[in-house]
């Protein structure tokens, strides 16, 4: 799958039952944050599940549903989640997709055929079913959850307010109004207080309507 493509219309088996993405997530106005891990009972993936569990409410408060994925069986997932709860005292609150036949993972093009495992991938999908963010991480290094939360907030603001976000943007900081494609509008922009150029116009985040903020 690629950026801006439609997410597959399918159902998947998870540790919390069968999920229909378009009915159970997008149909309820939620975003999907899908993250794949290489395998259950592996060290880096275990630390990621602990940290994603800690951040679960941060995502949920944004209207984002976390969903995990690997090509392990649902029974393997259950045993692993039990082990995490016993070792760390954390109950994993999000569903984890079981995909032992690799059918769903191949739809997303995230199977490492050499190892047979899913790669450490991330897909952020808006409520209209469009993929807004994709990232891949190496086997050897875990994901930084705070950065994934930041990019999630950025894409939600982009989706709602139709603005774009500058480098290192954090909620509360200025946003950017997309550049115009009409000459007269480009000329008028230079008179605006936060204009750096006709193509770079900042806007105060606090001027956005409340329902467009995060």
From Swiss-Prot:
Q: Which residues does UniProt call coiled coil? A: none
State its location(s): Cytoplasm
Q: Which family does it belong to?
A: Belongs to the peroxiredoxin family. Prx6 subfamily.
| Residues annotated for substrate binding in this entry | 120
* Keyword annotations: Antioxidant, Cytoplasm, Oxidoreductase, Peroxidase, Redox-active center
Q: What is the protein's known function?
A: Thiol-specific peroxidase that catalyzes the reduction of hydrogen peroxide and organic hydroperoxides to water and alcohols, respectively. Plays a role in cell protection against oxidative stress by detoxifying peroxides.
Query: What enzyme category does the UniProt record give?
Result: oxidoreductase
A Pfam family per the record: 1-cysPrx_C
Q: Which residues form the Thioredoxin domain?
A: 1-157
> Subunit structure, briefly?
Homodecamer. Pentamer of dimers that assemble into a ring structure.
What are the GO BP annotations of this UniProt entry?
cell redox homeostasis; cellular response to stress; hydrogen peroxide catabolic process; response to oxidative stress
InterPro entries linked: AhpC/TSA, Peroxiredoxin, Peroxiredoxin_AhpC-typ, Peroxiredoxin_C, Peroxiredoxin_TDXH, Thioredoxin-like_sf, Thioredoxin_domain
Which GO cellular component terms are attached? cytosol
Q: What else is known?
A: The active site is a conserved redox-active cysteine residue, the peroxidatic cysteine (C(P)), which makes the nucleophilic attack on the peroxide substrate. The peroxide oxidizes the C(P)-SH to cysteine sulfenic acid (C(P)-SOH), which then reacts with another cysteine residue, the resolving cysteine (C(R)), to form a disulfide bridge. The disulfide is subsequently reduced by an appropriate electron donor to complete the catalytic cycle. In this 1-Cys peroxiredoxin, no C(R) is present and C(P) instead forms a disulfide with a cysteine from another protein or with a small thiol molecule.
Catalytic residues in the record: 45 (cysteine sulfenic acid (-soh) intermediate)
Q: What reactions does this protein catalyze?
A: a hydroperoxide + [thioredoxin]-dithiol = an alcohol + [thioredoxin]-disulfide + H2O
Name assigned to this protein = Peroxiredoxin 2
A Gene Ontology molecular function term of the record: thioredoxin peroxidase activity
Species whose genome carries this gene: Sulfuracidifex metallicus (Sulfolobus metallicus)
PANTHER family xref list: ALKYL HYDROPEROXIDE REDUCTASE C, THIOREDOXIN PEROXIDASE
């Amino acid at each position: 799958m690629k950026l801006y493509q439609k997410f597959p219309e399918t159902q998947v088996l998870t540790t919390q039952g069968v999920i229909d993405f378009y009915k159970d997530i997008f149909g309820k106005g939620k975003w999907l944050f899908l993250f794949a891990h290489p395998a259950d009972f592996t060290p880096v993936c275990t630390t990621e599940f602990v940290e994603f569990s800690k951040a679960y409410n941060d995502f949920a408060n944004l209207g984002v549903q976390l969903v995990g994925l690997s090509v392990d069986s649902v029974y393997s997932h259950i045993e692993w989640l039990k082990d995490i709860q016993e070792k760390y005292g954390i109950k994993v609150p999000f569903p984890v997709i079981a995909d032992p036949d690799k059918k769903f993972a191949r739809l997303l093009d995230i199977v490492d055929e050499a190892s047979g495992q899913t790669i450490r991938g991330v897909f952020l999908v808006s409520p209209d079913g469009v993929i807004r963010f994709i990232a891949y991480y190496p086997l050897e290094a875990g994901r930084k959850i705070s950065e994934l939360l930041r990019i999630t907030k950025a894409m939600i603001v982009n989706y709602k307010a139709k603005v774009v976000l500058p480098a290192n943007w954090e909620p509360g900081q200025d946003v950017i109004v997309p550049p115009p494609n009409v000459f007269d509008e480009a000329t008028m922009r230079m008179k605006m207080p936060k204009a750096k150029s006709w193509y770079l116009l900042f806007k105060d985040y606090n001027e956005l309507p409340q329902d467009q903020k995060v």
